[in-house]
């Protein structure tokens, strides 16, 4: 078998060089600024609560509530502050499980929606109902992401810890697709389900998804205690080869993407201007899901002040660069255990 891992890493390396070159060209042409004076995109981790108990959860959602200090009222206050500062192009809604906020979720989204913000929603789909989907249909979406981790209820439900979760996710996906909202399926590939990858692509296509993201489990959060769900080298190589095959087979039917390797993602963020980050349930502003660094807390410091003081050049800091350089490509982890070790203030 070909070394598909090596091939994909070569493609990633070439992509990084092209991104760097394009940025330099656009800067010389005056088409790319030295920095962004305000985030273009923000991810709202609205709650640390979750109604499932997924083995791979990167941020350990549901573990003792994960310090949810940002109440719905505080999220609304933050949204108003963002609008007052000039607004953002994109808001990613996640958690935990964001639909646990009930009607208050829509209160938060309404504030940004009225200012022209478009959304990505990331959910396990369990709480989706026709009524909720109807309410979602008024917003502008880049996409609406539902996680389905098996072609059968048995595989998905065992992985996500709640019986009946597969059926609810599938029904929710159908409702989203039928409402004309762009549906993306996120599928975590493990040794237990890797043989059904093609079946999963077919299911996603039949559900009406425009894209499926096939990602391996990264050693972060709860996954660190569940090493049996992490692909070994041969399984990962097989997955990469299968993705290439399926991209050809399903061309013009459904977009099939693999999640990028950790070092590639981190290096790309370092090359580009910092364009955003994550507001966590405790108010901390985190650089990325997989980057264990914070620049402050919105409950203590205004977002704009924090961004201008620490956010713009955060990816260039010595601590972050040392972490990126420590990443082992085969193990997909660096010197800091993500969502296990304490995040570092930069």
Language-model segments: which ranges?
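Radical SAM enzyme [4Fe-4S]-AdoMet core and its adjacent flexible, acidic
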Residues: 2-5, 66, 142, 149, ...
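Flexible mid-to-C-terminal extensions adjoining Fe-S/redox cofactors in radical SAM and related proteins
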Residues: 2-38, 288-346
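Phosphate-coordinating loops and pocket residues in cytosolic domains that bind phosphorylated ligands
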Residues: 59, 130, 138, 158-161, ...
């Amino acid at each position: 078998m070909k070394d598909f891992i090596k091939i994909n890493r070569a493609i990633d390396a070439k992509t990084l060089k092209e991104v760097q070159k394009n940025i330099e060209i656009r800067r010389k042409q005056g088409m790319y600024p030295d920095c962004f004076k305000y985030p273009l995109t923000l991810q709202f981790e609205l709650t640390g609560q979750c109604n499932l108990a997924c083995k791979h959860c990167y941020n350990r959602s549901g573990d003792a509530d994960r310090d949810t200090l940002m109440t719905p009222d505080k999220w609304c206050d933050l949204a108003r502050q963002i609008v007052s500062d000039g607004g953002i192009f994109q808001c990613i809604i996640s958690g935990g499980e964001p639909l646990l906020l009930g009607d208050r979720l829509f209160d938060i989204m309404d504030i940004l929606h009225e200012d022209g913000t478009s959304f990505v929603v990331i959910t396990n789909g369990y709480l989706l109902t026709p009524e909720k989907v109807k309410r979602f249909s008024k917003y502008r979406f880049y996409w609406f992401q539902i996680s389905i981790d098996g072609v059968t209820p048995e595989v998905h439900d065992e992985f996500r810890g709640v019986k009946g979760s597969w059926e609810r996710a599938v029904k929710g996906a159908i409702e989203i697709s039928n409402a004309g909202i762009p549906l993306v399926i996120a599928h975590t590939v493990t040794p237990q389900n890797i043989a059904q990858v093609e079946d999963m692509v077919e299911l996603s296509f039949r559900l009406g998804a425009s894209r499926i993201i096939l990602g391996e489990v990264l050693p972060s959060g709860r996954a660190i205690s569940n090493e049996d769900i992490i692909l070994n080298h041969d399984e990962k190589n097989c997955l990469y080869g299968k993705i290439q095959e399926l991209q050809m087979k399903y061309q013009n039917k459904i977009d099939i993407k693999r999640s990028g390797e950790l070092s590639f993602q981190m290096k790309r963020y370092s090359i580009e201007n910092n364009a955003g980050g994550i507001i966590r349930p405790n108010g901390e502003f985190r650089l990325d899901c997989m980057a264990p660094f914070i620049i402050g807390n919105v409950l203590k410091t205004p977002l704009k002040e924090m961004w201008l003081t620490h956010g713009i050049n955060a990816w260039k800091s010595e601590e972050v660069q040392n972490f990126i350089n420590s990443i082992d490509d085969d193990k997909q982890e660096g010197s800091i255990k993500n969502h296990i070790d304490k995040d570092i203030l930069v």
